[in-house]
Each structure stands twice: as structure tokens, then as C-alpha cells.
Amino acid sequence: SKADVSIILKDKKNNTANGTTDKNGMLILPASEHKAYIFGYADGTFRPDNNMSRAEAAAIFARLISEQKGEKISGKSNFNDVSKSEWYSDYIGYLSKYGIIKGYSDNTFRPDDNVSRAEFVAMTVRFNSLFNDVKKGSYTVKYTDVATNYWAYSDVAYAKHAGWLN
């Protein structure tokens, strides 16, 4: 492959993005051609060693969907522990609308809890299914700590099949 080949991409809404290829033919888009998905904090920090909360993960997926669909992020959350006044309320409501996030049986979302690896994989598979035909259920996985009756088994198995997990 040849490096520095100019590429113009056009999406379903005729928005365009300009980029180039690297020496392996992979597309490189400049930062100006896409939005930021992970934000720093109001105090000017990034907190690279912190865990990610469920609310922060929701915000990332909401920003990705919003950009793909060309929509404003808004939505009403029906979870008991998500107040309209919280910074993450619209993100969680927006993802609920698309079925990307699920709460707990007590109708809570627990936005300040850390997001588990299984929860993140499940959100990723659900995100992918918004834009692609995802057929879960027929794949198996042999991780010793993921039983076939585990709540996210089909998501983990699909992600492994898709090559997202090693």
C-alpha cells in the first residue's frame, strides 16, 4: 500500500470527512474531522488512573451514537437514581431510548459504580447492533469464568467471535 493517499468519506447524510492513508493503507482522520468522545474534568484534570464509572461509559457511547446518527443527545431516564439535574441524565436517557444500557432489577442504574468489563462489552455489542446486523446466540466462548448462564454470555461470545476480545 501507498502512504498519504487522500481519501474523502461520505456518510448517509452526505457529510464528508477528509483523511489520508498510512503506510499500511489504514485511514487516518485528523482530529478536526470527528468529535471527542472522552472528556476531561471541570477542574482541568484527566485522571488517567481512575476507573471509569457507568455514567462516564454511558456518555462515551451516547456521543458515538449522536455523531453517527447526527442527533442531539437528550432523553428522559426512568431510573430511580438518575436525577434530571445530574450531568449524565441526558446521556443515560438517550442510551435507554436505544436499548444500549440496562439497569438493575431495583430500577436503578448506579451511575457512580465502576463499569465492569462485561457491562462494557454488552454496551459495545448493543452499540454495534444499532448500525450492523448482529446475530448473537450461536457463538460460544471458553473463558473459565464466564458460564453459559452468565447474564452477558452471548455478548461476550459475540465480541470474542468478532475479534474484539483476545
Regions found by a protein language model. Give the residues of each.
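Short, ordered, surface-exposed loop/turn motifs in non-cytosolic proteins
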Residues: 1-12
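Feature responds to low-complexity, polar/acidic, surface-exposed segments characteristic
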Residues: 23-55, 61-89, 97-98, 102-121, ...
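Short, acidic Ser/Thr/Gly-rich low-complexity loop/linker segments typical of extracellular
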Residues: 12-27
